């Protein structure tokens, strides 16, 4: 056996020699998604964490599929395309109906594809085994960092596009209906940043197609905060109580929700009401032009959101004034208290191979 504690790094994988040679059958896995609006530092934080010595066991890093988004689909740059459409819509040069069905919704579904695919692969290896509560990390444990959760492309970004006027309601519902099922014990680190600092970073890095649209940045940030509020609300509210409160929502609730998401910086609530959650978008009342006509469809979307989001554990990381190292240390603190899974050693080996191939084909 090689010397314990020696580290080998390969393709987004870092593991101790103990892990490489130990034949015991099971490993504990902490699956930690790092997410948030673009430009808040999530990728830098995850990569910094991969290099820190604080975690004793194996570390895996699944990259954001930037190559896939910018090169895969017929040579089109999906990130550039969707930002250009939103810019044209904001300037009044493109009507929402022109932009939405053939452009924003379609591009957003394309962006979601690699995230959905790999999420399915991950849970093929990890989802069928026993679940464990939090425990201090040991040399046999695996920390699996994933850059973006599928909910980013299937929920948070579409909600922001709808709130800022680039996506129509029917197209939003189409995207929400495609949210993948998420097993229990899924952990998300939600990174947040002052919008002015976020805009400065976006301009400074100068990625092709990325623009600073203040309305959209505000809507996107608040869609993530409302995701956290929704999860908190669901963990405190029974499903019958949710349905009762949902039926009481009005078009006035929706208008207030839109206004606040576009104009103010919302904060995660300890005990959020339903009008501070994403359910506020799905008001059923007859005054809402969408509500009565789509009531049956909306009821299924409410059920889907309730089932999926209740399973999440979200850790909030305000990154204002923090270095990448400080953010990475916070992520490690979250990992020590996060719920975890166990899976067989052979499954981990297969997962490592899948991660390396995914990063080579799709990663940034």
Swiss-Prot record:
GO terms for molecular function: ATP binding; thymidine kinase activity. GO terms for biological process: DNA biosynthetic process; TMP biosynthetic process. ATP binds at residues 36-43, 201. It catalyses: thymidine + ATP = dTMP + ADP + H(+). Its EC number is 2.7.1.21. SUPFAM superfamilies: P-loop containing nucleoside triphosphate hydrolases (SSF52540). Keywords: ATP-binding, DNA synthesis, Early protein, Kinase, Nucleotide-binding, Transferase. Substrate binds at residues 108, 207. It comes from the Viruses. The active site is at residue 64. Catalyzes the transfer of the gamma-phospho group of ATP to thymidine to generate dTMP in the salvage pathway of pyrimidine synthesis. The dTMP serves as a substrate for DNA polymerase during viral DNA replication. Allows the virus to be reactivated and to grow in non-proliferative cells lacking a high concentration of phosphorylated nucleic acid precursors. Belongs to the herpesviridae thymidine kinase family. Homodimer. This is Thymidine kinase. It comes from Infectious laryngotracheitis virus (strain Thorne V882).
């Amino acid at each position: 056996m090689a010397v314990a504690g020696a580290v080998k790094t390969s393709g987004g994988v870092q593991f101790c020699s103990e892990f490489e040679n130990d034949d015991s059958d099971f490993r504990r896995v902490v699956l930690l998604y790092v997410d948030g609006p673009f430009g808040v530092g999530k990728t830098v934080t995850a990569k910094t964490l991969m290099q820190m010595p604080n975690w004793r066991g194996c570390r895996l890093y699944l990259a954001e599929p930037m190559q896939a988004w910018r090169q895969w689909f017929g040579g089109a740059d999906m990130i550039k395309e969707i930002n250009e459409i939103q810019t044209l819509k904001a300037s009044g040069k493109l009507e929402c109906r022109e932009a939405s069905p053939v452009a924003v919704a379609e591009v957003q579904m394309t962006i979601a594809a690699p995230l959905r695919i790999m999420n399915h692969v991950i849970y093929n290896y990890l989802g069928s085994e026993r679940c464990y509560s939090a425990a201090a990390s040991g040399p046999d444990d695996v920390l699996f960092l994933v850059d973006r959760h599928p909910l980013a492309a299937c929920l948070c970004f579409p909600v922001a596009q709808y709130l800022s006027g680039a996506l129509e309601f029917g197209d939003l519902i189409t995207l929400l209906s495609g949210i993948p099922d998420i097993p229990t014990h899924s952990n998300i680190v939600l990174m947040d940043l002052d919008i002015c600092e976020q805009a400065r970073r976006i301009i400074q890095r100068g990625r092709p197609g990325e623009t600073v649209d203040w309305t959209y940045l505000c809507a996107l940030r608040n869609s993530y905060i409302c995701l956290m509020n929704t999860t908190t609300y669901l963990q405190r509210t029974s499903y019958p109580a949710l349905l009762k409160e949902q039926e009481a929502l009005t078009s006035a609730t929706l208008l207030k929700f839109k206004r606040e998401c576009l104009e103010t910086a919302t904060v995660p609530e300890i005990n959020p009401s339903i009008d501070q959650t994403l359910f506020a978008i799905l008001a059923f009342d007859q005054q809402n032009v969408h509500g009565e006509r789509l009531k049956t469809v909306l009821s299924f979307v409410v059920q889907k959101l309730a089932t999926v989001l209740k399973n999440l554990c979200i850790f909030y990381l305000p990154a204002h004034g923090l270095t990448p190292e400080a953010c990475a240390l916070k992520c490690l603190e979250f990992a020590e208290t996060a719920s975890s899974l166990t899976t067989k050693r052979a499954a981990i080996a297969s997962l490592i191979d899948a991660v390396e191939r995914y990063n080579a084909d799709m990663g940034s």
